[in-house]
Structure formats: C-alpha cells, structure tokens
Amino acid sequence: MDEIKITLGDLKSRRSILQGLGVAAVGISLAGLGACGKGGGDKGAAPGASAKIAPTGEEPKLNFYNWDTYIGETTLDDFKAASGTAVNMSLFATNDELFAKLRAGNPGFDVIVPSNDFVERMAPAGMIVPLDHKLIPNMKNIDPAFIDVAYDPGRKYSMPYTWLVLGIGYRKSKVKSVPDSWKPLFDSDEYKGRISLLSEAGDLFRLYGKYLGKSVNDLTPADIATIEKMMIKQKPFVKAFHEDNGQDLLGKGEVDLVLEYNGDIAQLMTEDDDVDFVVPKEGSQLNSDTLCIPKGAPHPKNAHAFINYLLDAEVGKKITETILYPTPNAAAKALMPAEYKNNPVIFPPAAAMAKCEYAKFRPDMQPLYEEAFTRVRAS
C-alpha cells in the first residue's frame, strides 16, 4: 500500500496554526490550557507514554487512517518510542471518503476513525472486525456513558475517541447579531457568498431537517425532496461546500459563517478572537468519532496496542490539549484544567445540547441523501 508517513510539520491547516503559536497556542477563553503541556512548547512525551509496550510479534509497522488535525503533537513518535512500531498516517476528509476507500477491500489500513453512524454502516457489512477487549485494558478509562451505546452496544467494534457537535462558526465583526439559527446558512441571502457548508451529504440533509423541526433520524423521502429544493435555492449564496477545512476558510477571511464542528472552531479561536461558535436554537447533530480495526488489517495486534495506547489517561490528555475536542476518556478529562472543562465551545450549554441528537445509519435513506446532494452540486 502506498502510504505517506505524516509528521505534524506536514499538516498545513489548523494544526500548523496551533503549532506556530508556541506559548500562546491556547489563548482567549482557552488561555489556561497553555500551562498544561502544549503551551510553553513542551514537546516531551506524556508520562503515560513512556512505559514500554511489549512486542506483539508483528512487524513494527502500523497504518493509521485518520482525520486531519486529530492527533497529539508527539503521539505517534511517543508510540514508536514506547513500542518500536512506526505509524504511517494517511488522512481523509469525510466519512464518505473513508467508506469509499474501504468498500472494495482494505488497501492496508490497521486502525481507522469512522463516526458513529458509519460504525453502524460498516459493522453489518463486515468492513470492521470485533475488538479483543482483553488487549485494550485502558478501556477502563472511558466514561461509562460511552460504553453501552446504541450504535455499538458493549463496544464490540469500536472504541470512542472523541465526541463532537455541529454548529456555526462565525466572524463576530461581520454579523449583525449571534447567528443562533440555521436560517443564515440554509434559507437566506443575507450573507450571500460569505457562507460555507459541509459536503457530507447525510450530515447536511439531517441538519436541514433540524431546521425544519424534524428529528435527524425521522426524515422521509418527501423531506429529502423538500430539502433538495431548498438547497438548490440556497446554492447561489454558498461560497463553498467544504470537506474538513471550513475553519480554514473562516480563518483566512474567505467566508464569515461556516458549518463546522465545535473542536475545529475551538482550535481557530486560539489565534483569532474575532471568531466564535454557536449551536443553533433548532438543535444540531452529535457525532462520536471512534477507533476501529478494518477487516483485513495487516497488523491487528499492533492495532489493538495502538488503540489501547490512545486510551491511556496521559496520552489522551496530550491529544485533547492539541485537538480541543470533547473527550469521552474520563481519566484524561480529569487531568485537564477547568478552562477546558468549562469552555462553552468545547462543551456547549446544556440547553443547547438538549436539542441535539446522534444520527443513526439508515440504509434506506443514505442513497437518497447522496443522490439528492449530487443533483444539488450539479445544479
């Protein structure tokens, strides 16, 4: 398999922004995080990362398929130092891309990071394999609320890596008031040419459904037809349908409002105090990104060792300091400062979260999302 080993210096989007900030990397409302490892330029391994990992008997190699800006600054090097196993990391931008890459067969990945609804989609299709919990003792660090989940009861196929919520990232100086509704993005010409929407079909259609007062899990073919017409009407006002880089468009001033994940905007806010994030009043979609082993993984023992390593408390803390997403790792969260735990972008207010839902994979609807969005893009 043609794989490229990615080092943090190779990543040119928001992770490189964070690294370039040095001591000031976690500023504004996240300022207190600067003292807890990432700030101050500490490049050393996390204490939990230094313990040696017993050899698995496999060749010292692991192929990791991950989202961009979604790992700690030294995590991969720390794992190599602890285990002797080198990690080759490739990047994907959407779950659709991940699924397409694996649909015809695993090209050689050992660990992948699908979202919850794609775990539901891939497990019945035999695309991911059951995990051996005996090889993942750090599972004990996971908050019990994330163990027996509807999309993967008992965590047979996946380990939780992060959880996240979609909302609106915006430039405060460019809006008349806080855009606390989906309307400016979905149903208005107020910010013509200054908005960007996600390009993942299912997420976008489900969020339009929330705007229309629907559950993300109750859309019908008639709803899809209605939403498709709305999207086509709105398309002339949309600057871009982005993949995993909406925060970059906002940061560069190319757009003023963007549909993005809270962690991505939290990262951007560390260097730009004119940026903020809101979960719209109609509610939104929650996601949980997970660690899975795809069928045909060439190094399954190394994969288990790597997943277990990522669930270590200190390792998880270092990852969380970098990516600024909510963590389901209770042991790691306990090590984080109050500035992280109490940040309303990373952990939105309870009133906003009460109207948010996890999306379920619906095999009857997924083709409709994709076909309708293809027509929208072509219109």
Language-model features, listed with the residues they occupy:
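N-terminal secretory signal peptides
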Residues: 1-13, 23-31
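Early extracytoplasmic/lumenal segment of secretory-pathway proteins
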Residues: 47-121
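Extracytoplasmic ligand-binding site segments that recognize negatively charged/polar headgroups
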Residues: 65, 70-72, 108-109, 113-254
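Conserved C-terminal helix/tail region of periplasmic/extracytoplasmic solute-binding proteins
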Residues: 350-379
